[in-house]
């Protein structure tokens, strides 16, 4: 890990836009991002994590989100981000045992702009308080939530991050319903809310109905937006679907939504999904 940190630090030092970007005046209060990082154990040839990790670092350095949720991240990928971005901290657990094993649906935040108040994780199953697989899911699935405070405005907000099942349609429907009900339970004071994640469903899926009665898709409401697919599959196969989302509620405006298709260094893709971000105003 020390070697990776040194390599990435050297790469980041030569990025021409870093110093100028830091001086730009923000026209928003909060920048949030969702990033399916692609599991670090996957055998993807030259797109495998062992080759593309510098692109992840360059993307985070370029985008500078205040808060972002990752999906499919293994413990060593979480530690890589922590080691290379000391301004950020994170919360989350491995879905397999509630500790470090398996994929993490972690939440990262910039400690200079955001303060974390409290957090928790629940499993998308009939027994959400313990590691478990629900309904017809192929895998254990979790949602991580955090109550946070924006340091500039003093505003409180909730951030929730999840990854719905890729096979079980009932697990996706029930899992999303569970998230909606938990949101209602957790957010008793009606704070602004952000939900990020890979939902493994298209925008017209009926399973989104309950969620859309409470929250809005940043992609749909932002005046500056795009309709780009979020799944790229490394440029192979059918990659024209939107399955990654940012939903929001309680903010006065969502000024921008963007699918991050930029190329970083020698890498065309930072994952088999494109990251997405939204800029929000309290």
Enumerate the predicted regions with their spans.
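N-terminal, active-site-proximal structural segment of metallo-dependent hydrolase catalytic domains
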Residues: 2-3, 19-84, 97-102, 177, ...
């Amino acid at each position: 890990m020390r070697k990776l940190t040194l390599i990435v630090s050297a790469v980041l030092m030569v990025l021409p836009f870093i110093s100028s970007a830091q001086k730009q005046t923000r026209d928003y209060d909060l920048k949030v991002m969702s990033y399916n990082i692609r599991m670090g154990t996957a055998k993807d040839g030259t797109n495998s994590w062992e080759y593309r990790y510098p692109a992840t670092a360059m993307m985070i350095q370029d985008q500078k989100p205040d808060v972002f949720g990752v999906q499919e991240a293994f413990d060593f990928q979480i530690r890589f981000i922590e080691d290379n971005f000391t301004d950020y901290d994170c919360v989350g657990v491995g879905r397999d045992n509630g500790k470090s094993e398996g994929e993490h649906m972690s939440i990262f935040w910039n400690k200079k702009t955001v303060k974390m108040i409290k957090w928790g994780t629940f499993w998308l199953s009939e027994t959400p308080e313990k590691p478990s697989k629900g309904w017809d899911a192929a895998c254990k699935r979790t949602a991580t939530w955090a109550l946070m405070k924006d340091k500039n405005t003093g505003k409180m907000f909730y951030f929730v991050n999840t990854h719905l099942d890729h096979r079980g349609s009932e697990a996706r429907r029930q899992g999303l319903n569970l998230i909606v009900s938990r949101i209602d339970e957790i957010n008793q004071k009606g704070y602004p809310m952000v939900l990020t994640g890979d939902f493994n469903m298209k925008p017209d899926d009926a399973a989104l109905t309950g969620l859309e009665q409470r929250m809005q898709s940043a992609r749909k409401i932002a005046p500056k937006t795009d309709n780009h697919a979020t799944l790229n599959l490394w440029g192979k196969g059918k990659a024209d679907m939107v399955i990654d989302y940012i939903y929001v509620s309680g903010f006065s405006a969502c000024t921008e939504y963007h699918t991050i298709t930029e190329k970083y260094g020698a890498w065309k893709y930072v994952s088999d999904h494109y990251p997405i971000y939204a800029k929000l105003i309290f």
